């Protein structure tokens, strides 16, 4: 008699799970092969987020055994749908080491690896989760954006994200994820780096669902409690989206220095900079030269350039959550030191200054620039180095990261620096022709000169080697447009019109002459 209930239970389980289990059982071996090849190095053989590379990553890789996922269309605390998992695998997670796999793996491989990932957690054996209905965004306007800002303040979003949305709120230095690892509040001015998407709808969905495993909560309960309305939460999403450019910034290889007939800007806040185009330069962690750095705080710098025919001015701006050194960020530094001690030795126990380096080929017209990480002893780079404490800029020769010799003699550079609402703005100015052309490049109009950038956040444990770097780009000084460029088209139009009028009049005279000589037609 005892065997009959067991048989019935087995039959019931087979009826309930049979079709789904058969699909999963078929997919899992194929998914395991994909996972072992492409995923286990970070996420670990058993999906616990403990792969051999995990110590080099912050945030740490996802622990699939916990069943906790940030990017979902489901309610807070629920599992993601298969579509949610597929989205993250396809697109990756900006700001983390997780890349998108759309171009690397086939559709079938991605579906197979989803089935295998789900096998790591017992929570996926239940009913499939369902996405919440978020409706559609209401129309926007200046008044709607202003209302969004008001609700942003009401919900105290500024405590983490800051008054201006730079991720520099008073709580920002204390933020940790569910695994007690330090985690940055998002910079709301860089929507192209938002996890889960950058549209108003994507942002609203994150507000409704939260980012499980992080300090970012769901605000669905605030709506349910009638503290705010659903429309007001949409307004917050619209306000947040308004802080970023409409389109992700295009990365261009050439920075054009605008030629001005007026005086060069007096500093980074000078309104004259409105006439110079801003170029976005992405930065990545310096992971080539030891000590390497896998957790940079700065991911991009905006560069503007202007010259007046005798001097060149560069304006550089980047988000920085602190003006280092800042005692409010001592707790953050302690957590970063604990999290990253396995990577090429410990960080400094106290904060250093914020740093900026702009490097050039030492001579104009070189076909190949030096090594992009500060040059080398064989081929040095010319470098401008700025520090926040003390606020100073120096030009000199670099023979590698952290290997810098300042120029002797009178200073060649002038500068002005400004820290405003979580953003550094630095202007550096120099004569086009340096005092010593054997050690520093001349800036020649109508000729591109290689240029590269390095930024370090002292509050994040960064220094002259541990920081964020760019590839080589080029700065090109515009030339005055010759008068003939403006005059020649006008003259051509006048000559063409005059010639056309002359031909018409000649044709009319011939026609009248023909009529007189042949009056009967």
Labelled PLM ranges:
Residues 56-102, 107-118, 174-241, 336-338, ...:
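Extracytoplasmic electron-transfer domains, predominantly the class I c-type cytochrome c fold
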């Amino acid at each position: 008699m005892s065997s009959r209930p067991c048989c019935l239970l087995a039959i019931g389980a087979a009826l309930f799970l049979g079709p789904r289990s058969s699909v999963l059982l078929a997919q899992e071996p194929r998914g395991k092969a994909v996972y072992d090849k492409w995923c286990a190095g970070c996420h670990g053989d058993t999906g616990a987020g403990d792969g051999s590379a995990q110590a080099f990553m912050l945030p740490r890789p996802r622990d699939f055994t916990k069943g906790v996922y940030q990017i979902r269309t489901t309610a807070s605390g629920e599992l993601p749908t298969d579509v949610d998992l597929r989205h993250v695998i396809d697109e990756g997670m900006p700001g983390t080491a997780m890349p998108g796999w759309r171009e690397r793996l086939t559709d079938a491989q991605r579906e197979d690896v989803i089935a295998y990932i789900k096998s790591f957690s017992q929570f996926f054996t239940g009913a499939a989760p369902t996405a919440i209905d978020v409706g559609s965004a209401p129309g926007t306007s200046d008044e709607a954006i202003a209302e969004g800002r008001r609700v942003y303040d009401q919900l105290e979003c500024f405590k983490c994200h800051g008054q201006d949305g730079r991720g520099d709120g008073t709580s920002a230095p204390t933020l940790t994820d569910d695994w007690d690892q330090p985690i940055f509040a998002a910079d709301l001015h860089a929507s192209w780096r938002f996890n889960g998407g950058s549209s108003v709808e994507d942002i609203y969905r994150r507000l409704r669902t939260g980012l499980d495993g992080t300090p970012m909560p769901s605000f669905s309960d605030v709506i349910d409690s009638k503290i705010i309305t659903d429309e007001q939460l949409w307004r917050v999403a619209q306000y947040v989206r308004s802080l970023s450019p409409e389109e992700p910034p295009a990365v261009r290889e050439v920075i054009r220095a605008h030629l001005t007939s007026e005086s060069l800007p007096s500093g980074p806040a000078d309104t004259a900079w409105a006439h110079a185009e801003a170029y976005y330069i992405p930065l990545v962690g310096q992971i080539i030269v030891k000590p390497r750095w896998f957790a940079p705080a700065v991911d991009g710098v905006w560069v503007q350039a202007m010259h007046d025919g005798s001097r060149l001015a560069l304006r550089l701006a980047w988000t920085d959550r602190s003006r280092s050194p800042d005692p409010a960020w001592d707790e953050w530094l302690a957590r970063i030191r604990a999290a990253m001690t396995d990577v090429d030795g410990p960080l400094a126990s106290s904060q250093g200054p914020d740093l900026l380096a702009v490097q050039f080929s030492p001579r104009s017209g070189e076909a190949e620039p030096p090594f992009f990480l500060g040059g080398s002893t064989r081929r040095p780079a010319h470098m401008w180095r700025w520090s926040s404490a003390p606020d100073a800029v120096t030009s000199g020769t670099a023979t590698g990261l952290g290997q810098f010799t300042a120029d002797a003699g009178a200073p060649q550079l002038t500068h002005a620096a400004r820290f405003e609402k979580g953003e550094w703005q630095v202007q550096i100015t120099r004569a086009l022709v340096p005092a010593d052309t054997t050690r520093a490049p001349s800036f020649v109009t109508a000729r591109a000169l290689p240029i590269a950038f390095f930024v370090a956040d002292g509050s994040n444990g960064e220094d002259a080697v541990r920081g964020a770097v760019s590839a080589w780009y080029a700065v090109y000084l515009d030339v005055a447009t010759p008068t003939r460029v403006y005059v020649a088209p006008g003259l051509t139009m006048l000559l063409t019109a005059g010639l056309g009028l002359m031909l018409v009049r000649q044709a009319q005279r011939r026609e009248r002459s023909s009529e007189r000589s042949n009056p009967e037609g």
